[in-house]
Amino acid sequence: FHQFWICKFAPFKEYKNFYKWANDYVDITQKYLGYAQVKDYSNARKKDFWHHIRYHIITFTQAEAGFSTDVKEIILEVDMKPITNKIIDKLHRDLVVKSSDGKLILADTGVKLQAKHLQLASGTVKFEDGSSRIIDDSKAVFVKEKFKRKKLGIFYKFKEELEMLKQTFGNELTTDLQEFDNSDKNIALQFISGREGLSLRNADFLVAINIDFSAVTYFQFRDRMTTMDRKENTLYWIFSKSGIEHKVYKAVQSKKSYTNDLFQKDFRIKATSKDNSQTYSRRLALR
């Protein structure tokens, strides 16, 4: 909206700000962030405004630019340690887990439960006091053993996953693109920071040890190895067996972000709103 709003010749100039525009073109809903209730403006009705702006937008696809890369995606499953699944089950059941040293994993809202579940499924956890811990390095060990003597671009989602990769790969890992291009080291990049503007053309494969809820991130991740002279790219997704990652992947591959509504449906969680907080009645659908 802002890019059009700053131009006096563009449509929508009669709206004083985004919020006035959103009242006419967005299905505004409520969502919970921690204990706060905020308005969600993400569901814009494209069918109502696209005819106003399509004449002002120029599209140029990779195919039109001469790119003809075939992207092959392979899912590999990893058996996580029993403790990992036990913590996930208990968190769904009780919404809180206490470690042996008194640290709390708290999932008192649907958004937090969704995020904690995904993080735990890849072997790390962030406690309520802000500290993090590696509880299961199965995915990192699997990647190191599976892809020996290969040059990898490894993507992770949560910060503690980088520490897990560093502990597993040691000196075989870098986070610097220049060092990656000029050595035999693998590179580790976070989805959000590594999804845009970086070319990993020197990687043999891209490997993701987790997955982001965003469909935009999914498609930008797929393009990190694309060049005009590279005809085939192979991407590996490392998922826990029967884990939440499979459900997220199904959504983002269909160009849909994995929302909390989808999470609640997949895991049979019924959320109710009362006094700006959420309580949950649960029946697990963990396979």
Question: Which ranges hold each PLM region?
Answer:
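Conserved RecA-like P-loop NTPase helicase motor core
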Residues: 162, 173-255
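Conserved RecA-like ASCE P-loop NTPase motor core of nucleic-acid helicases/translocases
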Residues: 151-158
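Non-catalytic, charged low-complexity extensions flanking SF2 helicase motor domains
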Residues: 234-287
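Signature of the SF2 helicase/ATPase Hel1-core->accessory helical subdomain module
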Residues: 1-30, 211-214, 225-228
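Catalytic donor nucleotide-activated moiety binding site of glycosyltransferases and closely related
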Residues: 159-166
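Inter-lobe coupling linker of SF2 helicases/translocases
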Residues: 12-150, 252
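Short beta-strand/turn micro-motifs composed of small residues
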Residues: 118-121, 156, 189, 239
